[in-house]
UniProtKB/Swiss-Prot annotation:
Matches recorded under PANTHER family: SPERM-ASSOCIATED ANTIGEN 11A-RELATED, SPERM-ASSOCIATED ANTIGEN 11A-RELATED-RELATED
Job of this protein: Has antimicrobial activity against E.coli. Plays a role in the defense response in the male reproductive tract, contributing to sperm maturation, storage and protection.
Family note: Belongs to the SPAG11 family.
Protein name: Sperm-associated antigen 11A
Record gene name: SPAG11A
Key word Acetylation present: no
Organism: Homo sapiens (Human)
Length: 123
C-alpha cells in the first residue's frame, strides 16, 4: 500500500513545486474590479472607444504615479564648457585643462578651441 502512494505523493509534490502561484490564486485583489464597476457607472461604454477609455483608466488607478527623474544642477562654468590652457612642459607646448604653476602661457577659452583657428607658436 505504501509503495502505491509514494509515486502519487511525489508527483503531487512535483506539481506543487512547479506551479507555486496557483495556491495564491484564491486571494483576488478586488480593487481593480471595484474601479472597473465605478467607471462603468460613471460613463457607460460606447463601443470600442468606451472600452479603451475604461481600460486605460483602470491601468491609471492601479499603477502608482511615476516620479520625475533626478535633476542635476550644473554650474555656469560647466554649462559653458571646459576651458583649455597651453602649457609648456618638458616635451614642449601642449593642450591641457590645467597647468602646474609656472608653465602656463595662454588661456584658451572653449569657443576658440572649437573654431580651431588658434596658431600654436613654437618657443
Amino acid at each position: 500500500m505504501r509503495q502505491r502512494l509514494l509515486p502519487s505523493v511525489t508527483s503531487l509534490l512535483l506539481v506543487a513545486l512547479l506551479f507555486p502561484g496557483s495556491s495564491q490564486a484564491r486571494h483576488v485583489n478586488h480593487s481593480a474590479t471595484e474601479a472597473l464597476g465605478e467607471l462603468r457607472e460613471r460613463a457607460p461604454g460606447q463601443g470600442t472607444n468606451g472600452f479603451q477609455l475604461l481600460r486605460h483608466a483602470v491601468k491609471r488607478d492601479l499603477l502608482p504615479p511615476r516620479t520625475p527623474p533626478y535633476q542635476v544642477h550644473i554650474s555656469h562654468q560647466e554649462a559653458r564648457g571646459p576651458s583649455f590652457k597651453i602649457c609648456v612642459g618638458f616635451l614642449g607646448p601642449r593642450w591641457a585643462r590645467g597647468c602646474s604653476t609656472g608653465n602656463e602661457k595662454y588661456h584658451l577659452p572653449y569657443a576658440a578651441r572649437d573654431l580651431q583657428t588658434f596658431f600654436l607658436p613654437f618657443w
